[in-house]
């Protein structure tokens, strides 16, 4: 099933690119700047030169204070659907104590096939690209990026980086992070490095038997779709991918959820109330009014602190 997911991701990227990116002559599916802008046109903020949405650094900092529950927004089709928060769990987490926030830079691989690879590599060389491998995308990373890779759950040969390239990713992204639906190698060497990382497995093999199919197009990670430029938030629980056009509203909502939890625990500390009298919403009108006043005060304090 995992391998089929990877093929579905590739097929989706390929079908999009066959219509949208005829200029991608190296058989690497990607978007032109105009296509990137068109397919992310709901975002009206700043962009990178390639058109990828660039959410503000301040939002990355805000997200570090949020839990998965606080940023999770129900949508059409169930929790995480409807174009809101896209959550994926069941990871091995390198540093559970670290929060990960950044902007998604996407890569997708597919299982290698010799006859296709010969054509792909030949066309890449015609464009001056020596090799379409993991380093092709890694070398494009910017500060604040999180590298998000669909390696279709591949274990042996699905090792997107070892310790040397992990170190490079950490330096290039300024510690942004790595999410790979695949594996790592050199875990002993990687473990001391202070960058968040989410992966499925480990294996001592070098990356192999996989062909780079797409860079900075929509990809599938588990059961969610990730777009280039998504706000990525990871903690010990899992990873959420937030469409940039929804990110500020979700962070504002998360502030209110955080304050509600804060107030709830303060009332529990008083020892006067049953849980059902306070959580999830206070029953007593006087308590509801007290909460609204507390919420207003704390929001003003939080907003004032962010202006400093």
Give, region by region, the residue ranges found by the protein language model.
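C-terminal segment of classical bacterial N-terminal signal peptides
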Residues: 15-23
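Feature captures the catalytic cores and cofactor-binding loops of soluble hydro-lyases/lyases
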Residues: 66-68, 80-228, 241-308
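Bacterial N-terminal signal peptides that target proteins for export
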Residues: 1-11
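N-terminal pre-domain segments of enzymes
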Residues: 27-71, 76-79
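Buried hydrophobic positions in well-ordered alpha/beta secondary-structure cores of metabolic enzymes
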Residues: 51, 169, 230-232
């Amino acid at each position: 099933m995992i391998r089929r997911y990877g093929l579905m991701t590739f097929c989706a990227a390929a079908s999009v690119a066959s219509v949208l990116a005829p200029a991608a002559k190296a058989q690497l599916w990607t978007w032109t700047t105009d296509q990137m802008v068109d397919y992310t046109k709901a975002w009206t903020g700043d962009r990178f030169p390639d058109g990828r949405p660039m959410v503000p650094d301040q939002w990355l900092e805000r997200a570090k204070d949020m839990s998965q529950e606080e940023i999770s927004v129900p949508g059409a089709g169930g929790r995480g659907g409807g174009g809101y928060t896209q959550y994926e769990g069941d990871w091995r987490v390198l540093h559970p104590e670290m929060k990960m926030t950044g902007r998604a830079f996407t890569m997708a691989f597919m299982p290698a096939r010799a006859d296709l690879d010969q054509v792909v590599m030949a066309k890449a060389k015609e464009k001056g690209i020596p090799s379409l491998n993991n380093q092709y995308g890694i070398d494009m990373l910017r500060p604040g990026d999180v590298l998000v890779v669909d390696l279709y759950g591949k274990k042996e040969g699905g090792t997107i980086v070892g310790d040397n390239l992990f170190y490079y990713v950490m330096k290039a992204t300024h510690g942004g992070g790595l999410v790979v639906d695949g594996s790592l190698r050199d875990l002993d060497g990687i473990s001391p490095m202070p960058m968040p990382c989410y992966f499925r497995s480990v294996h001592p093999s070098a990356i192999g038997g996989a062909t780079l199919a797409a860079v900075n197009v929509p990809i599938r990670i588990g059961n969610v779709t990730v777009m280039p430029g998504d706000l990525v938030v990871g903690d010990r629980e899992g990873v959420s991918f937030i469409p940039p056009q929804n990110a500020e509203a979700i962070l504002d909502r998360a502030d209110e959820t955080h304050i509600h939890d804060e107030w709830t625990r303060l009332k529990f500390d008083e020892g006067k109330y049953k849980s059902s009298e306070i959580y999830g919403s206070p029953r007593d009108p006087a308590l509801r009014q007290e909460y609204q006043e507390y919420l207003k005060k704390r929001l003003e304090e939080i907003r004032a602190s962010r202006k400093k």
